């Protein structure tokens, strides 16, 4: 799965960051018989992982506040850390990251969802790299997870 951050030109708000998810030919071929599997995966990763990172870490300064905690978990100096964001609570340990909706909690519309720590870390770093770039239609960062 490839997650790409880029900009589009919104007539009301100007250049606006947006994510795009693509799958490799290998993933498409492998999942060809599993009807809807990739679309479901794309929807879940967009709803939780990408939205969680984009909404809860809107600028580099906030990322830099949280990054030392993430690094401590990765190095094994901390068992777990939690980030209470505007969209989600991110409960992070070395194996996985759980997302619980900040306002609605665990509910039918937003069940508890998780991804691998490595996936979270890669998207988090890609988002930081993207935010450091010039705001331009040509600016983009692709992350493979």
Predicted regions and their residues:
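Charge-rich, low-complexity N-terminal segments
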Residues: 1-48
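Ser/Thr- (and often Asn-) enriched beta-sheet segments in non-cytosolic proteins
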Residues: 2-7, 20-22, 89-91, 96-98, ...
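A general marker of short, structured functional hotspots
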Residues: 3-4, 41-44, 62, 116, ...
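Generic alpha-helical secondary structure signal
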Residues: 11-12, 49-52, 124, 134
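Short, well-structured hydrophobic secondary-structure segments
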Residues: 29-75
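Amphipathic protein-protein interaction modules
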Residues: 68-128
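Short, highly charged C-terminal tails/helix-capping segments
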Residues: 133-145
């Amino acid at each position: 799965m490839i997650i790409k951050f880029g900009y589009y030109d919104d007539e009301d708000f100007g250049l606006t960051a947006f994510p795009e998810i693509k799958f490799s030919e290998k993933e498409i071929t492998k999942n060809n018989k599993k009807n809807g599997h990739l679309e479901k995966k794309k929807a879940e990763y967009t709803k939780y992982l990408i939205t969680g990172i984009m909404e809860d870490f809107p600028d580099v300064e906030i990322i830099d506040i949280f990054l030392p905690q993430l690094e401590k978990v990765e190095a094994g100096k901390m068992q777990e850390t939690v980030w209470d964001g505007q969209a989600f609570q991110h409960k992070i340990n070395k194996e996985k990251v759980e997302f619980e909706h900040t306002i609605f909690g665990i509910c039918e519309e937003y069940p508890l969802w998780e991804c691998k720590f490595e996936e979270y870390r890669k998207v988090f770093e890609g988002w930081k790299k993207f935010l450091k770039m010039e705001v331009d239609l040509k600016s983009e960062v692709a992350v493979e997870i």
